[in-house]
A protein has these predicted regions:
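Fe(II)/2-oxoglutarate oxygenase catalytic core
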Residues: 1-157
């Protein structure tokens, strides 16, 4: 497949008050972001149920940021129409059915995340976990970046 559009942009799609509400969801909950590396073996049931991922750690040569994962239905309902519309208007036309939990990322001055591919395909992938009933057996096809702060505060993608 040859894509003519690598990205799709909405400008000022969400009101500032809503952006501030989303930012507020992460207050006091942020943790230093880690990076995942592929695992070349299947996890045991005990490893999977523990929630502890082997080969996960902080590597500041690749990423300096803080994250919190959200599972807010109203936020999903807010962004899902944008995802579906972009999928069609950009000409991707992927078969998309659901979303992962929302990841709220905070970049302080000097923070970054080097070029990377979103999603995983190894045994740690959320898509390979049967408890994730809405996404099990699928793969991530699109990623959405929602910049919540004003341009003068940062927020370059």
């Amino acid at each position: 497949m040859v894509l003519t559009n690598q990205w799709y942009l909405y400008s000022a799609a969400i009101e500032k008050l809503v952006c501030d509400k989303i930012i507020g969801l992460g207050k006091e909950k942020f943790k230093k972001a880690s990076i995942d590396v592929p695992v070349s073996r299947d996890l045991s049931a005990e490893e999977r149920s523990s929630g502890i991922k082997p080969n996960v750690g902080v590597d500041e040569s690749i990423r300096i940021s803080d994250v919190v994962f959200l599972n807010e239905d109203w936020l999903f309902e807010l962004v899902w129409p944008f995802i579906k519309e972009a999928n069609v208007h950009a000409g991707w036309n992927y078969d998309i059915r659901s979303c992962e939990s929302q990841q709220l990322t905070r970049y302080k001055k000097g923070g970054y995340y080097k070029w990377h591919t979103d999603g995983r395909s190894d045994s740690l992938s959320a898509y390979n976990d049967p408890s994730n009933v809405h996404i099990n057996g699928y793969v991530r096809k699109l990623s959405l970046s929602l910049l919540l702060n004003d341009n003068f505060e940062g927020g370059e993608l």
